[in-house]
From Swiss-Prot:
Its main location: plastid. Gene3D superfamilies: Ribosomal protein L10e/L16 (3.90.1170.10). The gene is rpl16. GO terms for molecular function: rRNA binding; structural constituent of ribosome. Belongs to the universal ribosomal protein uL16 family. This is Large ribosomal subunit protein uL16c. GO terms for cellular component: chloroplast; mitochondrial large ribosomal subunit. PANTHER family: 50S/60S RIBOSOMAL PROTEIN L16 (PTHR12220), LARGE RIBOSOMAL SUBUNIT PROTEIN UL16M (PTHR12220:SF13). The lineage of its organism: Eukaryota, Viridiplantae, Streptophyta, Embryophyta, Tracheophyta.
């Protein structure tokens, strides 16, 4: 699963997801892509599940680019713990996704294969998303 090798700080504020994605919202590598339509935190497990789904469906053909990386630690407190005594320890990593962000890209396959593979990956995501293709 994806996670940073090292970070400057162990814990982060939650932050807020305002507005649309201004970076990473254009197709750069492949011909087809999955684009987010809602804001969300997407976990490293969900990213990996989507990547595996696309890889399995596409078989040997094509290439996949994962355009998001989980770089935000999410902390959790142990269950049945009293309040206080600091913030919990980091449990998993998430990627902050805003509307318009490209999640996956695909190339080297026909549009029908890409559409089917990306729709399977889209069903693994916790948000609404759309299939887009590079207009040439």
């Amino acid at each position: 699963m994806l996670s940073p090798k090292r970070t400057r700080f162990r814990k982060q504020h939650r932050g807020r997801m305002k507005g649309k994605s201004c970076r990473g919202n254009r197709i750069c590598f492949g011909r087809y892509a999955l684009q987010a339509l809602e804001p969300a935190w997407i976990t490293a497990r969900q990213i990996e599940a989507g990547r595996r789904a696309i890889t399995r469906y596409a078989r040997r053909g094509g290439k996949i680019w994962v355009r998001i990386f989980p770089d935000k630690p999410v902390t959790l407190r142990p269950t049945e713990t009293r309040m206080g005594s600091g913030k919990g320890s980091p449990e998993y990593w998430v990627s902050v996704v805003k509307p318009g962000r490209i999640l996956y890209e695909m190339g080297g396959v026909s549009e029908t294969v890409a559409r089917a593979a990306i729709s399977i990956a889209a069903s693994k995501m916790p948000i609404r998303s759309q299939f887009i293709r590079l207009e040439i």
